[in-house]
Design a protein with these regions (language model features):
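Charged, cofactor-coupling segments
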Residues: 1-110
């Protein structure tokens, strides 16, 4: 698709939902993408104006079987572990014992 000109006039506002979709694609083979939905919420307000941030609104573990920890940076591991901790804290109170055991395994720290 050809885009005649860039349009930067759009803006994110409180309550808008978007997705975060990191992925990898191997040309001519396949691709894989992990998707989470995020909501735009108010953050800090200062002399420069109202800042916004994103909060997760979907809480599903990322499949650790598809991850090679040795290829991740320390920051990437920290982000994944923090996300899985949040998934555990949000979801586990609503699960029975068997379901909690499953979630514990799939949100384990790497």
């Amino acid at each position: 698709r050809v885009v005649a000109e860039r349009n930067d006039s759009g803006r994110l506002e409180e309550g808008m939902i978007t997705t975060d979709e990191p992925g990898v694609y191997l040309e001519g083979e396949y691709g894989i993408r992990t998707e989470n939905e995020l909501i735009c919420v108010k953050a800090e307000k200062n002399e420069y104006g109202q800042f916004m941030k994103f909060e997760n609104i979907t809480y599903a573990p990322i499949d650790l079987d598809g991850i090679v920890p040795e290829e991740m940076t320390g920051r990437e591991k920290k982000l994944l572990n923090a996300y899985h901790k949040m998934v555990w804290e949000k979801i586990s109170p609503y699960l029975n014992d068997d379901e909690r055991e499953w979630l514990k395994e799939y949100t384990r720290e790497i």
